[in-house]
Amino acid sequence: NYIFRNLLKIFDVIIQDNKNIPSYQMQCRGCAAKVDFNSLKTTLSKEIITTSEDAININNYPKLYQSVDMISSIVSDPYLLGKIAANHAISDIIAVNSKLISALMILQLPYSNSKINSRDLEQVISGASEVFKLAGCSISGGHTMVGKDKDPVIGFSVIGEKKSVNKKNLNQISLELKEVS
């Protein structure tokens, strides 16, 4: 699967770029920063949270799955950050054997002047759009804000449509799942 091979290359670049920094630790505050499932399950009603799956089925629409993912900056390049965040969000949809059909961006940039914010916004969108285009989708909107974090925080709310499994595509789906695992 092209998207996952691309994501692995991106992470290899991150590791290579940071391997000479003795105190380097990945601190993306993405998946590693999630509130644990038991806390969520205890606090939220069973109607809100029923599973720990990466993407959930949308009620009354058996073929539609939705997910949301966010990460803070693990690289200084906004373009590359956009690509990483898009791949991160898409992987949840692929994990439930679905094709991406919609993406909304959630982005917080650090307080800065308009010129820097415009430049960073353009770069994040450009990187993410490149990845979403490969997945057959585009960013259709979202929400932006500025905040006190010194680094950008980016996320996507994504929707996918479940792929049907038949004799013709069973081998292809099996190969895609092997590449993911």
Predicted regions and their residues:
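Glycine-rich anion-binding loops of enzyme active sites
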Residues: 64-66, 70-72, 99-181
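C-terminal catalytic lobe of FAD-dependent flavoproteins
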Residues: 1
